[in-house]
């Protein structure tokens, strides 16, 4: 299965039990910042934004004072799982990032999708990739 298929079929799909509700953007990005696959709507990010995200996974709390930036959009960092999941909020939407052995799985959402639904979609794929040694 191609990485693009994972994005299209497992991240940008309808959310279980909520037909028509889906993430607004998603991607799988290597730890080095190389894009493995992304939705057409995923923002163009700067290398320093990806460096900040990777630093926060290695040093939890790093982004809390400044916020998480992706594609020039600033998200307020909210509770996550140290070294495993970063979550951010901006207005009625937000972002979830799950770290696997080799990649970062990104999901960006807006209402009516809820933070919990975004977390479920992103973390389920991230957990699957971890189980596969990725």
Swiss-Prot record:
Source superkingdom: Eukaryota
PTM characteristics: Phosphorylated by MAP kinases.
Record keywords, A-Z: Actin-binding, Allergen, Cytoplasm, Cytoskeleton, Disulfide bond, Phosphoprotein
Keyword Transport: no
Subcellular location: Cytoplasm, Cytoskeleton
Gene Ontology cellular-component terms listed: cell cortex; cytoskeleton
InterPro entries: PFN, PFN_euk, PFN_sf, Profilin_CS
Motif (Involved in PIP2 interaction): 84-100
Note: The variability of the residues taking part of IgE-binding epitopes might be responsible of the difference in cross-reactivity among olive pollen cultivars, and between distantly related pollen species, leading to a variable range of allergy reactions among atopic patients.
Protein name as annotated: Profilin-3
Organism: Olea europaea (Common olive)
Lineage: Eukaryota, Viridiplantae, Streptophyta, Embryophyta, Tracheophyta
């Amino acid at each position: 299965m191609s990485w693009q298929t994972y994005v299209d079929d497992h991240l940008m799909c309808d959310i279980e039990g909520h037909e028509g509700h889906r993430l607004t953007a998603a991607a799988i990005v290597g730890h080095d910042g190389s894009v493995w696959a992304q939705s057409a709507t995923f923002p163009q990010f700067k290398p320093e934004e990806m460096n900040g995200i990777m630093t926060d996974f290695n040093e939890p709390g790093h982004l809390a004072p400044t916020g998480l930036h992706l594609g020039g959009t600033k998200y307020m960092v909210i509770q996550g799982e140290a070294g495993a999941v970063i979550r951010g909020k901006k207005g009625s939407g937000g972002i979830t990032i799950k770290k696997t052995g080799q990649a970062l799985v990104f999901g960006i959402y807006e209402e009516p999708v809820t933070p919990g639904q975004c977390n479920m979609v992103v973390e389920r794929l991230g957990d699957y990739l971890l189980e596969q040694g990725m």
